UniProtKB/Swiss-Prot annotation:
One of its GO terms (biological process) is light-independent chlorophyll biosynthetic process. Keywords: 4Fe-4S, ATP-binding, Chlorophyll biosynthesis, Chloroplast, Iron, Iron-sulfur, Magnesium, Metal-binding, Nucleotide-binding, Oxidoreductase, Photosynthesis, Plastid. It comes from the Eukaryota. [4Fe-4S] cluster binds at residues 95, 129. It comes from Picea abies (Norway spruce). One of its GO terms (molecular function) is metal ion binding. The gene is chlL. It catalyses: chlorophyllide a + oxidized 2[4Fe-4S]-[ferredoxin] + 2 ADP + 2 phosphate = protochlorophyllide a + reduced 2[4Fe-4S]-[ferredoxin] + 2 ATP + 2 H2O. This is Light-independent protochlorophyllide reductase iron-sulfur ATP-binding protein.
Length: 291
């Protein structure tokens, strides 16, 4: 099974992806996580350091695939999860989709692409071109990470459009949304009412999740010396169980941009309450922070 994880930049995709990968490994799956971001930090919480990228390795070998061994590009992470970082082209040049294609090509050359029960692609930011949508060419399911803010749901809607387009020629389905760092879910509920799709899980705001990223550890590793965090791991195990159930999934139909803006801004402009609290609610509903 191949899963592509998308979502707005900074929403917590990599942290979520790493914890889902460990959860899947805990369920007995052989897992490979592929980071698809020029920052090459997708697998940081699994390995504790920035591993060399596929592109760096190819360049060092003058793109001679026959000179590359699996251990040159596949690194062992926490919980037995194997890790690969695709890397990216130089800033302002090249195409991210090409890099993903080269990564898959190399893994196939190494006879590694089909050795895993689960391959999870952790993909950068919003879908803004066909190149960034390239991992969807290989995925069976897409999982969208969001929060209860306008920007994250707007990005989710763009990703939804890309899934619909790719599903015309590939056996791709949307598994559902995962809410991250979400103290309330009124905008999420409003969105999925208008654009029906499953909500796999909604994680509340948990400071230890953010701290785990800074420490370079998954929640599963942290729970070894902080047992009180076990309840957080259960969220990710629940997500893993839903993925392993091989859900039917859906081919979603995105909402037109103007309609989505009107839908979500209506709740922003007409919150319940008044006075200073009303103004504060308006800022929070759209994910804005006044500085």
């Amino acid at each position: 099974m191949k899963i592509a994880v998308y979502g707005k930049g900074g929403i917590g995709k990599s942290t979520t992806s790493c914890n889902i990968s460990v959860a899947l490994a805990r369920r007995g799956q052989k897992v490979l996580q592929i980071g698809c971001d020029p920052k090459h930090d997708s697998t940081f919480t699994l390995t504790g350091f920035l591993i060399p990228t596929i592109i760096d390795t190819l360049q060092s070998k003058d793109y001679h695939y026959e000179d590359i061994w699996p251990e040159d590009v596949i690194h062992k992470g926490y919980g037995g999860v194997d890790c690969v970082e695709a890397g990216g082209p130089p800033a302002g040049a090249g195409c991210g989709g090409y890099v993903v294609g080269e990564t898959v090509k190399l893994l196939k050359e190494l006879n590694a692409f089909y050795e895993y029960d689960i391959i999870l692609f952790d993909v950068l930011g919003d879908v803004v071109c066909g190149g960034f949508a390239a991992p969807l060419n290989y995925a069976d399911y897409c999982v969208i990470i969001t929060d209860n803010g306008f920007d994250a749901l707007f990005a989710a809607n763009r990703i939804t459009a890309s899934i619909r387009e790719k599903a015309r020629t590939h056996p791709l389905r949307l598994a559902g949304l995962v809410g991250n760092r979400t103290s309330r879910r009124d905008l999420i509920n409003k969105y999925v009412e208008a654009c029906p799709m499953p909500v796999i899980e909604v994680l509340p705001i948990i400071e230890d999740i953010r701290v785990s990223r800074v420490k370079g550890k998954t929640l599963f590793e942290m729970v070894g010396f902080e047992p009180s965090l076990n309840y957080v791991c259960n969220y990710y195990l629940g997500i893993a169980d839903q993925i392993l159930s091989q859900p039917e999934g859906i081919v979603p139909k995105e909402i037109p941009d103007r309609e989505l803006f009107s839908l979500l801004s209506d709740l922003y402009l007409n919150p319940i309450g008044g006075g200073g609290q009303k103004k504060k609610n308006q800022e929070n509903l759209l994910g804005f922070t006044r500085i």
